């Protein structure tokens, strides 16, 4: 049987959750489908993280729709999978292929009007989409997929000059208002927990450097290649997102059995209460950074299984193409 041909499109400029989702998904799909991907030429980090067996089409940041249309016409795909709204609006509706979009962010009806199907990752988005979106609608949780640990806790503490006995509170994301790193930083300064270190990791950290002058127990790092090393370093994971459509990092922290402090938002409210996670409002006076009785927590994360979730998306493709389940 001829392999289903898929063209993914992600024309972002950085590397965060949406880009990781794409790389993970095409890693899985390359075993079963004929997969290619369209990315911006200048996004070297994304390009370097894409499976080397997958064909990459690189485009420049001008006249993107014209370039993408040419690639699609030449590739003759069965499925075009758009990631983020700027990719979705560059694809015109066609009777020659099906267009599906993953709503990594909040979606706009005008941008997704050409899509045949939409994947969302939480119930709030699903309810919103039922009112506005006319195509096929699917809800699919994200997954966890992490690299093996390559540097142990002792090595990293020494490298980062963290005192051996200090409790490490950590968060991984982006230094963007959405992620709430400013809230974590403010709260940590206010409470000033003894014998502890705050470690915040993500793109855009340079703008925060002036906020941690004279704070030897606060460390900011930029993008890192292996998050597993740092989850393994954390004693407690802290997430203060103002909003998310899901939240990769919270589920990743669960894989490391970390005690977790998190805000509540539309991306996690479907499932967060099923787990032993401390839900907090970072703007209130309640104490958050406790340093005593910190123990590992066992979570059942089977609902976020990588292979199961990717297989689910494969079935979505097949349903759009009218291919019956085996």
Language-model-derived ranges and their functions:
Residues 116-151:
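Donor nucleotide-sugar binding/catalytic pocket of nucleotide-sugar-dependent glycosyltransferases
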Residues 61-64, 82-88, 103:
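Short His-centered aromatic/hydrophobic patch
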Residues 43-50, 197-221:
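Short, structured helix-loop element that forms part of the nucleotide-activated donor/catalytic region
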Residues 16-24, 167, 171-190:
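A conserved mid-protein helix/loop that constitutes part of the nucleotide-sugar donor-binding site
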Residues 17, 293-326:
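A charged, aromatic-enriched C-terminal amphipathic alpha-helix characteristic of glycosyltransferases
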Residues 39, 259-262:
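Short hydrophobic beta-strand element within catalytic cores of glycosyltransferases
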Residues 8-64, 204:
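N-terminal strand-loop element at the rim of the active site
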Residues 223, 242:
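Aromatic "clamp/platform" in nucleotide-sugar-dependent glycosyltransferases that forms part
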């Amino acid at each position: 049987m001829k392999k289903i041909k898929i063209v993914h499109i992600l024309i972002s400029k950085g590397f965060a959750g949406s880009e990781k989702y794409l790389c993970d998904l095409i890693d899985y799909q390359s075993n079963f489908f004929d997969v290619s991907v369209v990315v911006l030429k200048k996004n070297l980090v994304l390009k370097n993280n894409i499976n080397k067996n997958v064909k990459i089409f690189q485009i420049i940041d001008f006249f993107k729709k014209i370039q993408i249309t040419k690639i699609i016409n030449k590739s003759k795909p069965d499925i075009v999978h758009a990631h983020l709204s700027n990719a979705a609006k560059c694809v015109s509706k066609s009777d020659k292929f099906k267009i599906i979009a993953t709503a990594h962010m909040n979606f706009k009806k005008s941008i997704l009007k050409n899509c045949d199907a939409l994947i969302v990752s939480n119930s709030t988005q699903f309810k919103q989409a039922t009112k506005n979106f006319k195509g096929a609608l699917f809800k699919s949780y994200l997954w966890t997929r992490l690299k093996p640990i390559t540097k142990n806790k002792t090595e990293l503490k020494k490298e980062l000059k963290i005192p051996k006995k200090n409790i490490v509170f950590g968060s991984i994301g982006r230094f963007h208002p959405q992620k709430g790193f400013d809230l974590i930083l403010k709260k940590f300064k206010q409470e000033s927990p003894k014998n502890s270190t705050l470690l915040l990791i993500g793109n855009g950290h340079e703008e925060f450097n002036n906020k941690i002058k004279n704070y030897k127990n606060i460390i900011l790092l930029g993008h890192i290649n292996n998050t597993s090393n740092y989850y393994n370093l954390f004693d407690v994971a802290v997430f203060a997102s103002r909003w998310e459509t899901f939240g990769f990092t919270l589920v990743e922290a669960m894989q490391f059995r970390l005690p977790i402090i998190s805000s509540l938002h539309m991306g996690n409210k479907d499932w967060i209460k099923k787990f032993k996670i401390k839900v907090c409002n970072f703007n209130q006076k309640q104490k958050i950074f406790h340093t005593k009785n910190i123990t590992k927590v066992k979570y059942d994360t089977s609902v976020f299984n990588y292979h199961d979730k990717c297989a689910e998306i494969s079935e979505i493709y097949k349903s759009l193409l009218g291919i019956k389940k085996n």
